[in-house]
Every structure is written in structure tokens, then in C-alpha cells.
Design a protein with these regions (language model features):
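Glycine-enriched, solvent-exposed interface loops adjoining structured elements
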Residues: 1-197
Length: 197
């Protein structure tokens, strides 16, 4: 919980608060909360955390709406048609190529992300398509810290270290060692999340 790491963050930053509450509307807490949210978004975008993975289905349609917590597509095999063959669907990133694919649909299906939707070159059929994505929600159910009871989807020590080095940088204090420690811990946590020693 955020309330568990907050006293340590404040101590590292040299801020003395009895019974700190991240939701308090005082300058120090607003500043720490802002840096914490910047650090949390950075940590969540740099690693495909197992608890940030989501999926949804699109059935009998040429397009489907993206979830509200959508951040980006999963790295490998993000879209698969669910028929007997489990056909992978390739991404299309160019609007010009998409126009060509719409006019001359290839055998290999493609998808395009645009305007909060995912579009397919062919109808997904009754079996549908499974779409895997990475959620923007790095705090349980939301994408920002608001209270001491909030819980992150990644190790909270990363959030603490990421917040502290950013605070020191903002104040013009030496932060290189803290940032290097954060980066090493981040790599270790990412490997651990993937089950790699």
C-alpha cells in the first residue's frame, strides 16, 4: 500500500510529516503525489507487467472498441483469430497501407488502431478475435495514486525509488546514484515478473 512506503519516501526527501496522507492538499503532498504518478506511469509503460495484461474479444465484426484502460497492444501475438487455426493478426501502422489493405484484402489478416477502436481487414467471424493489451491502470483499478490505501501492480519499492530520485532531481540535488539503483532494481523486478532469474 502507498501508506506503507510514504513515510520512507518522505524521510529520503527530508520531509518530516507525522501520519502522512498522500491525499492531503498541502504543497509537499501534492508535489510527492505528482512525482509518484509520473514515476508510476513511467514504470508501467516501460515493462509489460503480468498484472497489467488484459484481453477482450471481438465477435462477428470488422471492428471493436478498445477498453477505457487501454495503453498499448501486448508485445507478441497481440491479436489472434480464435478459429481452429488460431491465426495471428498482423498490425498495420500506416494509414496509407491500411487503405490499400481495405481495397485488396490479403489472406493474412491485419488490424489497425484508430479513434479508440481496433479495425480488421476481414470480419472476425463467429469464432471472433482475442485481443491482448497492456492496461494503463498501474494502481488497482485506476491510473493514478490518490490515497494511502492504493496498491500498485508492480513492486512498490520501484515507486518509492522512482519518486525519490525525481524529487532530488527537481530540487537540484545529486540523484545519479539513486537513479542507477532504481534502474537496476527495475530490471531485476521486470525479470522476476517474467519468471527469469
Amino acid at each position: 500500500m502507498i501508506g506503507d512506503i510514504l513515510p520512507d519516501i518522505l524521510a529520503e526527501c527530508g520531509l518530516d510529516r507525522a501520519s502522512p496522507d498522500i491525499g492531503e492538499n498541502i504543497f509537499e503532498m501534492r508535489q510527492i503525489r505528482s512525482l509518484m504518478n509520473v514515476a508510476g506511469r513511467d514504470i508501467n509503460t516501460r515493462v509489460e507487467w503480468s498484472r497489467a495484461q488484459g484481453s477482450f474479444g471481438v465477435t462477428s465484426a470488422a471492428f471493436g472498441a478498445l477498453p477505457v484502460d487501454f495503453q498499448r497492444m501486448a508485445n507478441a501475438g497481440a491479436v489472434i483469430f480464435d478459429g481452429n487455426d488460431h491465426i495471428p493478426v498482423r498490425p498495420c501502422v500506416s494509414p496509407e497501407l491500411w487503405q490499400l489493405l481495405e481495397k485488396f484484402p490479403p489472406e493474412q489478416p491485419y488490424y489497425l488502431l484508430r479513434d479508440g477502436r481496433i479495425y480488421f481487414t476481414v470480419d472476425t467471424g463467429a469464432e471472433g478475435a482475442l485481443v491482448r493489451y497492456v492496461s494503463a491502470n498501474w494502481v488497482s483499478g485506476t491510473d493514478a495514486v490518490a490515497s494511502n490505501a492504493d496498491v500498485t501492480i508492480f513492486p512498490e519499492r520501484l515507486l518509492a525509488k522512482g519518486t525519490v530520485w525525481r524529487w532530488k532531481r527537481q530540487k537540484g540535488l545529486p540523484y545519479d546514484d539513486l537513479m542507477a539503483e532504481f534502474e537496476a532494481d527495475m530490471e531485476s523486478a521486470a525479470r522476476s515478473d517474467r519468471g527469469i532469474q
